[in-house]
């Protein structure tokens, strides 16, 4: 029986059918089969799995896997799942970087131009202009300087914002004030008018934005979280908003998704809730990237470079 490529995850039959069609068109020499339709023999023989926010147990039920290709940039659900070294390939895609950078810029403008205040005033039928704050007078701090963070930094700089960036390890980027480590993070936070979280979720970044680090931000600063929910301690964020130390938070990711109806974030006047839409996967672009990785594997027998299991990205 010819080996198949497993497709694991997807949000229901409609998305599964869409992904299957686009991926199959990009890889005409491969036979992709959704996990739920695979026979026992196909599950035992599959060497490659393409995953979209999968149930880790389903991926672990493919004992012959040689490597796993994610259609998302984040792979935290898979790191540590397997009892053997297994390359996990996160999606590194120029189109995803472009759309994420676009979202960072859009919601930075939303905060810089006081849109939350004007929306509140409209509900109160209050006509009250606010002083204009130039982009050149606004400091944006980026938590994370990988492919997505670097693209966002470039877009913000081009728009005139002063950008500072933090990463776990030393990095340099032309025109960006960069820092790393615990000291570098605290040094950056004190300058931020807007803090953007775009860092992978790992054991080290879980709870990274806590009460102490929120307190280190400039009074009146705002927060954008486009990374993963657990990077920000929700209770600490709400306390900082309630005290007035933070002016607003734009949240696209949460500890539990979809965000439960009973969450206090829904009704909080200083929170904008988004349904995880900041960096959507463009399937045509992603399929081309995945197809190139798979062709290389078929030619060389070597899987692509995976995430560092110790770092989680």
Language model: regions and residue ranges:
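N-terminal glycine-/charge-rich "phosphate-binding" loop or analogous flexible N-terminal tail
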Residues: 1-46
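Short acidic low-complexity segments
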Residues: 33-44, 56-59, 175-191
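Glycine-rich NAD(P)-binding loop of Rossmann-like domains
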Residues: 119-151
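Phosphate-coordination loops involved in phosphoryl transfer and adenosine-cofactor binding
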Residues: 2, 136-139, 220
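Phosphate/diphosphate ligand-binding glycine-rich loop within oxidoreductases
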Residues: 47-119
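Conserved beta-strand positions in the Rossmann-like core of class I SAM-dependent methyltransferases
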Residues: 164
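Rossmann-like adenosine-cofactor binding region
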Residues: 169-264
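C-terminal helix-to-coil terminal segments
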Residues: 19, 90-91, 95-103, 117, ...
